[in-house]
Amino acid sequence: MLDKVKNVIVVLSGKGGVGKSTVSTQLSLALRKNGFKVGLLDIDLCGPSVPYLLGLEGRDIFQCDEGWVPVYTDEFQTLAVMSIGFLLKNREDPVIWRGPKKTMMIRQFLTDVRWDELDYLIIDTPPGTSDEHITVMECLKEVGCHGAIIVTTPQEVALDDVRKEITFCKKTGINILGIVENMSGFVCPHCTSCTNIFSSNGGVSLATYAQVPHLGTLPIDPRVGVLAGTTTSVLDELPDSTTAEVLTHLVEKLKTMLAS
């Protein structure tokens, strides 16, 4: 039930381990910080990490006449979250499903969740271009998807896989809003200087290759990692950090792009 959702954004990456779920959660929190009502849908069925990242493990979802009721992070219901992680008894329980069952679950997430009125729905996806992605794109064609944010790290091995994701978006007709380069440089926890421990500017070159906007470059910041397991936004806890600056600019760019 996405008829009350104004903007649907899919967060993608062809490579695992690039911090896509962290980007999704912190982007959702940043949008909430800016006064928007936000939904976060985690469709990584085999590796759901959003409940852990937001400290919501152990919370239950319920059914009402209108469908599943998502988990809310606060009493004001400004951030709604849905994940298969809420349906598992233990975090260690594996989801061993074949494609058709995964497809059915994702369709349920997209059609049977009572999101109410949302300014943004952020959909965090698993890496790759598998059944899950095809199902999401097919379902979103019926209700409309406003675009995809693609997350990469600067290393060439990640860029190769992310190029495939760009091709996937073009073939399925999904508009690419832009590319976020994550884990670019390491922020010293003592002096906060940033050192490039890997290659750099991979996201910039990828954006140039795909002819899409470069939405920002996020470093590895141990102070941000400490926020895992909470609903605290980087914008609140570390307002002067590079991560907060990039997320602030990202929110402004999204507002501009989706308003036009």
UniProtKB/Swiss-Prot annotation:
Give me the comment on cofactor binding: Binds 4 [4Fe-4S] clusters per heterotetramer. Contains two stable clusters in the N-termini of Nubp1 and two labile, bridging clusters between subunits of the Nubp1-Nubp2 heterotetramer.
Question: Which is a Pfam family this sequence falls into?
Answer: ParA
Q: Which UniProt keywords apply?
A: 4Fe-4S, ATP-binding, Cytoplasm, Iron, Iron-sulfur, Metal-binding, Nucleotide-binding
Cofactors that this protein relies on? [4Fe-4S] cluster
Q: Which PROSITE patterns match?
A: MRP (PS01215)
**Which molecular-function annotations from GO does this UniProt entry contain?**
4 iron, 4 sulfur cluster binding; ATP binding; ATP-dependent FeS chaperone activity; metal ion binding
Primary site of residence:
cytoplasm
Q: How does it assemble?
A: Heterotetramer of 2 Nubp1 and 2 Nubp2 chains.
Q: What is this protein called?
A: Cytosolic Fe-S cluster assembly factor Nubp2 homolog
| Taxonomic source organism | Drosophila simulans (Fruit fly)
Lineage of producing organism = Eukaryota, Metazoa, Ecdysozoa, Arthropoda, Hexapoda
